[in-house]
Amino acid sequence: MLKPLGNRVIIKRVESEQTTKSGIVLTEKAKEKSNEGKVIAVGPGRLLDNGERVTPEVKEGDTVVFEQYAGSEVQVGEDKYLVISEEEVLAIVQ
């Protein structure tokens, strides 16, 4: 498993719908990548110049919305994850 460093967050994307509202089935190429996902792991937080750490606002298990082109995609086995900085998280879904 991946262990994020600093203010980074590991996210598993939530798959987007495979059919449109009108019933059209989308192929893998036609589907847009979702910018919503579940937080799998959270780093210890950003380190400040004075040596203190900023506690992350997100936690494991949160469903979040993040910037469209955020982070780097990483594959571990069959699973794909997104590694992003916490600043790229826009909101927590409640």
UniProtKB/Swiss-Prot annotation:
Q: In terms of one coarse class, where is the protein primarily found?
A: cytoplasm
Cellular component per GO?
cytoplasm
The UniProt entry's coiled-coil ranges are: none
* SMART domains, sorted: Cpn10 (SM00883)
The record's keywords, sorted A to Z, are: Chaperone, Cytoplasm
Gene Ontology molecular function, alphabetical: ATP binding; metal ion binding; protein folding chaperone; protein-folding chaperone binding; unfolded protein binding
The keyword Zinc-finger belongs to this UniProt entry's keyword annotation = no
Query: Biological process GO terms, please?
Result: chaperone cofactor-dependent protein refolding
* Cellular location(s): Cytoplasm
The record describes the protein's role as: Together with the chaperonin GroEL, plays an essential role in assisting protein folding. The GroEL-GroES system forms a nano-cage that allows encapsulation of the non-native substrate proteins and provides a physical environment optimized to promote and accelerate protein folding. GroES binds to the apical surface of the GroEL ring, thereby capping the opening of the GroEL channel.
- UniProt xrefs under NCBIfam families: PRK00364.2-2, PRK00364.2-3, PRK00364.2-4, PRK00364.2-5
Report the family membership.
Belongs to the GroES chaperonin family.
**What PANTHER family does the database record attribute to this sequence?**
10 KDA HEAT SHOCK PROTEIN, CO-CHAPERONIN GROES
The record's note on quaternary structure and interaction partners says: Heptamer of 7 subunits arranged in a ring. Interacts with the chaperonin GroEL.
State the protein's name.
Answer: Co-chaperonin GroES
